[in-house]
């Protein structure tokens, strides 16, 4: 269950879309994308506007498997120089990951001026003012060649 709205950095965000990521016929997590009321999901990503991506997990997942999947996707989406610049922050972000249990919620928030925050079960676990990090990490789900084109299409549908 995802809330229909979320308050972030003095912006009222509305849930634009939600979808489920399925891998080998098993539901892995549900995802919900939030953006400002007056913007479409695609506008929020392309501009970029304040946004939130929330994941609700159905399965146990080892944190190192999550990190590996993130790196595979980031390496597909970005050149080596970009990843080299972002690596210290990516490593710090990944260091906050915990082994995932069913019912866990991870949320990534982006707000202009405050950058990226990662929440784990409602608590801020990581924060960075770097908009390039926010763009790259949210891009794992919201940019082309990400984890799942089907999930991305569902989350960004108008």
Report the location of each language-model feature.
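Short strand-turn-strand beta-turns centered on an Asx-Gly dipeptide
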Residues: 120-122
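Short polybasic amphipathic segments
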Residues: 4-6, 115-118
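Mid-length scaffold segments of soluble, non-membrane domains
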Residues: 43-116
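Secretory/extracellular carbohydrate-interaction modules
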Residues: 1-76
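Flexible glycine-rich active-site/ligand-binding loops centered on an Asp-His dyad
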Residues: 126-151
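Short, solvent-exposed loop/turn motifs
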Residues: 12, 124-125
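Cysteine/selenocysteine-centered motifs that mediate thiol-based redox chemistry or coordinate metal-sulfur cofactors
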Residues: 150-158
């Amino acid at each position: 269950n995802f809330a229909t709205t979320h308050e972030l950095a003095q912006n009222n965000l509305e849930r634009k879309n939600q979808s489920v990521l399925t891998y080998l016929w098993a539901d892995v997590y549900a995802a919900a994308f939030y953006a400002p009321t007056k913007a479409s999901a695609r506008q929020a990503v392309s501009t970029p506007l304040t946004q939130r991506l929330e994941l609700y997990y159905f399965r146990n997942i080892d944190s190192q498997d999550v990190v590996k999947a993130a790196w595979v996707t980031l390496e597909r989406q970005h050149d080596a120089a970009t990843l080299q610049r972002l690596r210290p922050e990516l490593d710090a972000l990944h260091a906050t990951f915990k082994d995932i249990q069913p019912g866990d919620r991870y949320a990534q928030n982006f707000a202009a001026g405050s950058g990226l925050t990662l929440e784990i079960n409602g608590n801020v676990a990581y924060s960075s003012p770097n908009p390039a990090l926010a763009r790259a990490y949210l891009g794992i789900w919201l940019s082309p060649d990400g984890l799942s084109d089907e999930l991305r299409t569902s989350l960004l549908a108008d």
